[in-house]
């Protein structure tokens, strides 16, 4: 049984954590940020569990909105499974945390909470196509770069927990790609999308937000938006515009696309909370700069 726990990050249906019940107790896929840990504890309690019951935490990648509370479960005894390229940052998060603090400043703790290191004895680096057998369930790790070099999509039977590689889709809106720096690579992302497609899943569980069952239309739409945003940003990069100069125009561009589909201001605000415009501007401008320098 898979349960979706809404972490209510700034608004509802922004960040999900997934609770999977097994014969060896609950497994958590995605912890969300530490700032929403109390909501996750409440969600566990609704299903009869407390944090110390969770022995296995599976992360899609180490961004704060997906992995920020992993250390809190490790303190309660859980093992945390992570991509090899994310391992050292969770063991010693000082560099990761301080770099984010330079961006968020005084809002850092309010938005994301705290982050402590996870002992190596409670972490496992997971290679591509590694299999975890937990309580009668079989979780397969698929390395899926594009959004982040340390990204994993977790397969459970005909279900895939996609993190950010299958985009954000907040009902009743469309899918959009979260494109934060520093790792955005559109070519890798397209390859990862085809990897997901070729696994023939029945359901994708998006961290932002929830289940998707019309797989091919969803993935095709994601590719189309990635290409559109990428080309839009390539023009601005060619004009040598800064993140600060581009962000207002891009925010309006993305919002206008949502408005044309009939989304309300509140629904558009949910998208901005889950996928802030400035992050995609920074990520895609950096992508084009790296392409130019390659």
Model-derived features: positions:
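Divalent metal-coordination and catalytic microenvironments
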Residues: 20, 30, 40, 61, ...
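C-terminal regulatory/interaction regions
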Residues: 232-294
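Divalent-metal (often Zn2+) His-rich catalytic cores of metallo-beta-lactamase-fold enzymes
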Residues: 76, 190-243
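Metal-dependent catalytic neighborhoods of phosphoester/phosphodiester hydrolases
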Residues: 67-76, 92-93
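Conserved beta-strand hairpin/beta-sheet module of binuclear metal-dependent hydrolase folds
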Residues: 1-51, 154-162
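Metallo-beta-lactamase
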Residues: 33, 53-65, 90-143, 149-216
